[in-house]
Structure formats: C-alpha cells, structure tokens
Design a protein with these regions (language model features):
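Structural/interface elements that position substrates and couple domains in central-metabolism enzymes
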Residues: 2-449
Length: 449
C-alpha cells in the first residue's frame, strides 16, 4: 500500500470512536484544525446530549465552555456526532482515532468495550486507512490485540493494507484542549510508514511536539509508567500525611519543609486516595505482561493498596474522633464528591468511597455537597445538600473530599462558614482547602490528610 504525500495532506475527514472525556475534546480539537469530524459512540442518549451541548465536562478553550463549543460545532455542519457506524466510517482515506477505554472488572482489565469497537471498525475498514489508538492500553495490546482483531474482521493486513499506531494521550481533565495540543506526544506504528504517517496526522491536529518512538510497546509502557509514577508518589505522600496526623504534626508544614530540599521538591500532595479512570487502573495494564514475564511489582502493588485504603482510613479516623468526643451520632458532611478538585467526574472517586463507608458504618446523619458532579453518576443514595452552608449546618465533622467553588483554590478565607457547625467539631481536610490556624481559632479541630 502506498499513500501519496499530497493525497495524505489533503485528507480532511476524521472519525473519533468514543466520545468520552478524551474523545469529545479531541474530536473538537480535530474540528478546529480544519477536519470534518465524525464522532461515533454507542450511547444514543449521550449522543443527543452532545448534539445539544449538554455534557457534564468542565473544559474551556479561549474562555469558552465546551458546551458552547459543541453547539457551534454541530451548527457548522462539519461535526457529526452519531451512533451509526456506516455514517461515521463511510468514506475513503479513513483516518480513525480510537478512544475507547479498558475498564476493570473484578480487578482485571476488561477489553470487551474495545473489542466491540474493533468489531464495528474492522467490518468497515477500508484499504489505506490510518488507525491511531489513543486510550491507555494494556502493554502489548496494539500489536497483540488490536492488530489481529482488525485483521480478522477486515481481511486486510495491518502492515500492508492499512496503518496502525498507538499514541498516548497525556491530557488532564479540566485542561484537555490545551494539553491535547501542548503536551509532547509520543507515537509509534507497527511499521516505519505507520509511525511517520501517524506523526504527520497528529501534527495536522495541531499537536506542537510529536515524538516518533521505536515501537508501540515502548509508547504503551511509557504511558502506563507515567500513571503509575503518580500513583506511587501519591501513596508516599499519603503515608507521610498519615504519620504526621498520628503524631499531631501539621502535615502541610512538614511537606513544605521537605520541598525546600532541591532534590525532593517534586513531592506530591497527599489526599483522600486516587480517583478517576487513569491512575487507579494503570497497575492493572502492566500486571498481565509482567506476570507473563515473571516480573514482580511489589512497590507498585503496595502503593496501589495504600491509595485504595486511604478512603477507609479517613472514614475511620472521623468515626474514631466522633466516638472519642462522645458524638457517635453526630452529623458528618462530605464537601466535594469528584475524583479530583474542580472536576465533574466521580469515577473511582475516593470521596465517594468515603461516603459509601460512612453510609454503612455511621449511625448518624450523613450529608454531601457537590455542585459539579452529576448525582446519577455517583450511584449512591445520599442526602445531597443544596448549598455548602446547609451541608455544614449542624455538622460535628466535615470531610473535604474535593475542592469545588466556593471551596476555592488555596485556603478558604471566610471561615465563618464553620460557625454553623455543632461543636466540638472536626475538619478532615484532604485537599488543604482550609487554613489550619484559622480553623483552630474558630474552635474546630483540624486534621490534614
């Protein structure tokens, strides 16, 4: 198969399969780069929301919300969200980006959604197509899972008849548009031609720095390592925080002192655990090939367990404090349910895990507040407060699970909010949202984790 460079540069259609937290902003990035874009997703109700700009994402570009960008995109006539594969893939010179994730089922990577997407794509794949997988994969999946599946479904060779590559996405939710084009982006195909072709394609999307790697396995492994590195470092910070709390030390002060050392200034912040789709699952994308090769991962596995246990540790610390204060039935308020600060995403949220544990083990009132997270996504029967003030009112303990406005960046200046608590009272601040000294001056005990 030959792809003429002039022909390549005039290809103007792109199909993005999977319009989630990666695929949706990526599809809009392709549109802004001049492509006509087809966005394919199996969720019919979600596609209708996309067409209306009704999505639960906190992304902005140039001061405009993703919701406004979506409405304008659909009205342009060059952006086509659809559930119909024949519509999304019915053109020659196909350029396809796969952003279908691999969730965990019973602690193991489950590629069933990816497999289904590949069946849909493979049955419609045309000679000369370019396929770039961008969702994080189990190491070895580009060559060992995606390629054979597409070959079996299409009857074509992934080295001769179409090009297949893997390129890791490194965007963080809330910064998607900037980081999709601004972050250095590695890519590698099954062949040198696939590598160079996919690199040119990514550059046409507006990505400023594309690195051509030696093989897909190198890019897959690097991506998983990136996520694991953060998971491990957060686990270390969480253990530091747990130690400081047990010894009555100011966690924030101690960590700031540590960071004055120039060789450890990168120390992560502790928190309620690690949430979202990416970091908690990374170990499970590395484990299958590691086990097959007989390579142990004790540090990685222990760190994952530390972060898994952190929500339970925080919940138990709160319950122990209430018991010692004679407030076993006291109201507990959880402020912020998102998986990280200023997010709409509650997948794998440690704050939700805290709420789930307290719902099962706390005999008193439990209230939660989060203006950004869709309650349907939490999948937990809770007493949702309409305002921050009503959540805090009468509470014996507050757990800060995630900062959301008006829990603004840095310290909350108006600690008069705490005057509504039922004292003696406690704040378990997993996000350093409150100033410790100001809280103590209000007669409220303070723990930073």
């Amino acid at each position: 198969m030959r792809v003429d460079i002039v022909e390549l540069l005039t290809m103007d259609k792109v199909t993005v399969i999977g319009l989630g937290y990666v695929g949706l902003p990526l599809s809009l990035t392709a549109l802004s780069a001049g492509f006509e874009v087809f966005g394919l997703d199996v969720r019919a109700d979600y596609i209708e929301k996309v067409k209306r700009g009704d999505v639960q994402m906190a992304e902005t570009q140039g001061g405009r919300s993703i919701q406004d960008i979506l409405v304008e995109a659909v009205e342009s006539g060059r952006y086509h969200p659809t559930t119909k594969p024949d519509e999304a893939l019915g053109y020659d010179n196909q350029q396809i980006i796969l952003t279908v994730g691999i969730p965990l089922r019973d602690g193991k990577a489950d590629p069933s959604m990816l497999n289904s997407a590949l069946e849909t794509l493979g049955a419609r794949l045309r000679k000369g197509a370019l396929v770039v997988a961008r969702s994080t994969l189990v190491v070895g999946y580009t060559r060992g899972f995606i390629a054979p599946k597409l070959q079996n479904m299409s009857g074509m060779s992934p080295t001769d008849d179409f090009d297949l590559a893997f390129s890791s996405e490194r965007m963080a939710e809330g910064s998607a548009f900037d980081e999709l084009v601004g972050m250095v982006t590695p890519v590698a195909g099954l062949t040198p031609r696939a590598t160079s072709r996919s690199a040119r394609f990514l550059e046409r999307l507006g990505i400023k720095s594309v690195i051509q790697a030696s093989c897909p396995e190198a890019v897959e492994t690097a991506k998983v390592f990136e996520n694991i590195a953060r998971d491990v470092n957060i686990a270390l910070a969480n253990e530091y925080a747990n130690f400081c709390t047990a010894f009555g030390l100011d966690t924030k002060e101690v960590l700031e002192l540590v960071r004055t050392h120039k060789r450890v200034g990168f120390l992560h912040h502790p928190g309620p655990g690690v949430g979202g789709h990416c970091l908690p699952q990374a170990m499970h994308y590395l484990k299958p090939p590691a086990e097959e090769a007989g390579v142990g991962l004790p540090v990685i596995e222990t760190s994952r367990q530390v972060n898994c246990n952190q929500p339970i540790h925080i919940a138990r610390l709160t319950l122990d404090w209430l018991k010692d204060a004679g407030r076993q039935k006291g109201k507990v308020a959880i402020l912020g349910l998102a998986m990280k600060d200023y997010s709409t995403d509650a997948r794998w949220s440690p704050a939700v895990d805290i709420a789930r544990y307290l719902k099962a083990h706390h005999g008193g009132e439990l209230a939660v507040w989060d203006d950004n997270v869709d309650r349907e996504h939490v999948n937990l029967d809770l007493d949702y407060a309409d305002t921050l003030e009503s959540a805090v009112a009468g509470a014996s303990a507050i757990i800060v699970g995630a900062r959301q406005s008006p829990l603004v960046t840095g310290s909350v200046n108006d600690v008069s909010l705490l005057d509504g608590m039922d004292k003696p009272a406690l704040i378990v601040d997993t996000r350093f949202a409150f100033d410790r000294k100001s809280v103590l001056e209000r007669g409220v005990d303070y723990r930073a984790l």
